[in-house]
């Protein structure tokens, strides 16, 4: 059976991108009892990215998990630019995120073959991330009307693309695991939008889990979904990509205003940061909406 896990990073901040990731696995079966809070496989931590990385801390745990997963499918990005090109769907990096290139070779060189074994045994297959910078985010927010709708649509597009890329027939068994989208419990409408010719059967809709069946597919939207490994790895990819891009964003602004303290982009600190860069933003003739997410 095929397993697709999805999750995001950057749903709440005002600065920086929203990153949504889908990972594809192929397994003989999937064990729902394999709940994890954080697990260690040959020195590689797999778990909720919010537990593996804290603002201002080391990215090492995320780096090792993400790069081990990629190494298991023969992908070895030398730097973050290559990572964005290989994994991410983004046409061009905005100028505030353009440099410096961050080398990943030191961490890649420290990985041991046994650390790949977990991903090989779990048949990790592919990863796809959508990187949405503030200007595009604001346009999509206006189009979809809410953050929850925006996230649901981006997520379903990634799922559909993964299925299409592999030519998977919907008669095959496909299990899609998603972290819940902003507390939403009902996903019938969004599934109908992307699978118009399919009959959507509601199996369960609750605060904890929402389950839907259509032909050979099952969708599970799970509260605290990072407890499932395919969702956890998607969470790690999303967070790692976002944090690498935020390092570039802070580098740009520290070149413009050497005394400014870096920001993680979340609302309270984002207000402080915006107040400090507002005049420089005018000098750069850059509209606030190009870097500030409206919600």
Language model feature labels by segment:
Residues 1-295:
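RNase H-like, Mg2+-dependent phosphodiesterase core
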């Amino acid at each position: 059976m095929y397993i697709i896990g999805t999750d995001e990073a950057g749903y709440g901040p005002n600065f920086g991108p929203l990153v949504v990731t889908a990972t594809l696995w192929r397994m003989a079966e999937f064990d729902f009892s394999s709940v994890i809070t954080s697990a260690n496989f040959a020195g590689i931590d797999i778990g909720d990215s919010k537990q593996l990385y804290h603002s201002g801390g080391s990215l090492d745990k995320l780096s090792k998990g993400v790069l081990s997963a990629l190494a298991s499918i023969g992908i070895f990005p030398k730097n973050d630019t290559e990572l964005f090109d290989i994994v991410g769907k983004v046409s061009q990096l905005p100028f505030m995120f353009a440099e410096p290139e961050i080398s990943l070779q030191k961490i890649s060189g420290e990985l041991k073959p046994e650390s790949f074994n977990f991903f090989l045994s779990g048949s990790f297959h592919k990863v796809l991330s959508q990187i949405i910078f503030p200007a595009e985010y604001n346009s999509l927010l206006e189009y979809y009307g809410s953050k929850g709708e925006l996230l649901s649509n981006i997520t379903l597009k990634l799922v559909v693309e993964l299925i299409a890329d592999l030519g998977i027939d919907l008669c095959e068994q496909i299990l899609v695991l998603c972290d819940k989208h902003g507390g939403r419990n009902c996903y019938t409408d969004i599934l109908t939008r992307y699978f118009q010719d399919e009959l959507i059967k509601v199996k369960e809709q609750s605060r904890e889990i929402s389950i839907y069946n259509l032909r050979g597919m099952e969708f599970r939207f799970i509260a605290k979904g990072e407890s499932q490994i395919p969702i956890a790895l998607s969470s790690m990819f999303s967070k790692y990509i976002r944090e690498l891009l935020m390092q570039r964003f802070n580098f740009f602004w520290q070149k413009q205003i050497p005394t400014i303290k870096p920001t993680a982009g979340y609302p309270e600190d984002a207000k402080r940061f915006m107040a400090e860069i507002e005049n420089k933003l005018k000098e750069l003739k850059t509209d606030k909406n190009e870097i500030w997410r409206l919600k």
